[in-house]
Amino acid sequence: MASTSSLLNFLSPLFPSNTSLPPSSNPKFPNPNSLSSQQNSISISSKKHENAAIAKKEEYPGDLMAVVCPSLAFSNTLYFRSAYNVQVLVDDNENEERLLNRFRREVMRAGVIQECKRRRYFENKQEEKKRKHREAAKRNSRRRRGPFRGPFPGKEEATKVDKKEDDGDNWDMPEGGAPF
């Protein structure tokens, strides 16, 4: 019995407390610029979950949380570059087809569809290495090929020179008879 109570005391930071703090009206998100120098760890709270509250570092040390459950150490921290995967700004009087093509190009560039397909199934380490190797090969082949430039400029000049030489040649039979 004593061992279970000491275990419960040790794991108490993982369980919500019975004392309820007044719920905040809007969720609180950490500032991405101050994540490294942050004094307090912040939990996301809403009216639906009254037992989720802001926890001070002095109350529950972060080192203990990282040791007990490392995957949950930064579970409440949100990392993102922007609010959207792809963002296309619409110009005034822009054609719908052009807008749709720009959106499709941005989605392909961001790799949103490929990421969705990849996340659909579990991928072990070997499959992940294969996928990354394939993606790197695609990127490198695109770099090697470069953009399509059409016919080579040297070829056009060579054909023009041949036409001038053909004009100087006379393969017609002379009007007179053969001398022999």
Curated annotation (Swiss-Prot):
Subcellular location: Plastid, Chloroplast
Bias (Basic and acidic residues): 154-166
Biased composition (Low complexity): 14-45
Annotated region described as Disordered, given as residue ranges: 14-49, 124-180
Cellular component per GO, a single term: chloroplast
UniProt entry keywords in alphabetical sequence: Chloroplast, Plastid, Ribonucleoprotein, Ribosomal protein, RNA-binding, rRNA-binding, Transit peptide
HAMAP family, per the entry: Ribosomal_bS21
Similarity field: Belongs to the bacterial ribosomal protein bS21 family.
PANTHER family xref list: MITOCHONDRIAL 28S RIBOSOMAL PROTEIN S21, SMALL RIBOSOMAL SUBUNIT PROTEIN BS21M
Name this polypeptide is given: Small ribosomal subunit protein bS21c
Species for this entry: Spinacia oleracea
The encoding gene: rps21
